[in-house]
Amino acid sequence: MSEDTSNSTHFGYKTIEAEKKADLVAGVFHSVAAKYDIMNDVMSFGIHRMWKRFTIESAGARPGMKVLDLAGGTGDLTAKFSRIIGDTGQVTLADINDSMLKVGREKLRDKGIVGNVNYVQANAEALPFPDNHFDIITIAFGLRNVTDKDAAIASMLRVLKPGGKLLVLEFSKPQHDIMRKVYDLYSFKVLPKMGSLITKDADSYEYLAESIRMHPDQDTLKQMMEDAGFEQVNYTNMTDGIVALHKGYKF
């Protein structure tokens, strides 16, 4: 069942009209785009690089494949996939936010990554790609910002080739009480202050902390993927479940 049937949704802890969420989320990422990479390193103490490395390893990309890096933002995963798939493959970096796409494009071009990457501004709920098109889809730290997650998961299934794999890297639920308490303290007391110091925008990082708490937990997201039609769905917790990587296949 789509989570948008009541015509309302969550923006952090606030309940809003569903059609307003995309614009509000866009405002958050327009605000933080220029400092996004710096904040990722600071607020995760660099651990996000380990989470992303595990995602790349789990994807099993090979030369010649077509990869969709959805909500790919500043292009961390795209850069790594580009090197793996080579000249015969293609990575599509897609994001709904044009500010994030601009930062990603400039960053990758500065690194000399140009030949096998294209950029598309796209809404995850209605992907503008043909059926059965991609070998691999990744969405890293993006699904929780989508208004209708069920629609997005169904759209990803549609554009995957049979045999293709979806990997969802996302903040999730810590598994132990002490970690939950430390994580809550950090998220709601420390993180907004970091956001204020580095990006001059505490409110956006308060939203990001709230959006993590409102995102489905590990087993709920697994069920959502299965309900959409993905098979062999499983997940791996990292850093005690602060982050989880979900994997599912289209057959």
From Swiss-Prot:
Any Pfam family matching the protein: Ubie_methyltran
UniProt: S-adenosyl-L-methionine binding residues: 74, 95, 123-124
SUPFAM superfamilies hit by this protein: S-adenosyl-L-methionine-dependent methyltransferases
Transmembrane segments: none
KW Transferase (keyword) present: yes
Domain of life assignment: Bacteria
Swiss-Prot/TrEMBL catalytic activity: a 2-demethylmenaquinol + S-adenosyl-L-methionine = a menaquinol + S-adenosyl-L-homocysteine + H(+); a 2-methoxy-6-(all-trans-polyprenyl)benzene-1,4-diol + S-adenosyl-L-methionine = a 5-methoxy-2-methyl-3-(all-trans-polyprenyl)benzene-1,4-diol + S-adenosyl-L-homocysteine + H(+)
Keyword Transmembrane: no
Top-rank EC class of the record's enzyme: transferase
Classification via Gene3D superfamilies: Vaccinia Virus protein VP39 (3.40.50.150)
Record GO terms (molecular function): 2-methoxy-6-polyprenyl-1,4-benzoquinol methyltransferase activity; demethylmenaquinone methyltransferase activity
GO biological process assignments: aerobic respiration; menaquinone biosynthetic process; methylation
Pathway involvement of the protein, from the record: Quinol/quinone metabolism; menaquinone biosynthesis; menaquinol from 1,4-dihydroxy-2-naphthoate: step 2/2; Cofactor biosynthesis; ubiquinone biosynthesis
Keywords of the record: Menaquinone biosynthesis, Methyltransferase, S-adenosyl-L-methionine, Transferase, Ubiquinone biosynthesis
InterPro entries, per the entry: SAM-dependent_MTases_sf, UbiE/COQ5_MeTrFase, UbiE/COQ5_MeTrFase_CS
UniProt-listed Enzyme Commission number(s): 2.1.1.163, 2.1.1.201
Family: Belongs to the class I-like SAM-binding methyltransferase superfamily. MenG/UbiE family.
Listed PANTHER family: 2-METHOXY-6-POLYPRENYL-1,4-BENZOQUINOL METHYLASE, MITOCHONDRIAL, METHYLTRANSFERASE
NCBIfam families with a match to the protein in the record: MenG_MenH_UbiE, PRK00216.1-1, PRK00216.1-3, PRK00216.1-5
Function: Methyltransferase required for the conversion of demethylmenaquinol (DMKH2) to menaquinol (MKH2) and the conversion of 2-polyprenyl-6-methoxy-1,4-benzoquinol (DDMQH2) to 2-polyprenyl-3-methyl-6-methoxy-1,4-benzoquinol (DMQH2).
Name of the molecule in the record: Ubiquinone/menaquinone biosynthesis C-methyltransferase UbiE
Organism of this sequence: Shewanella halifaxensis (strain HAW-EB4)
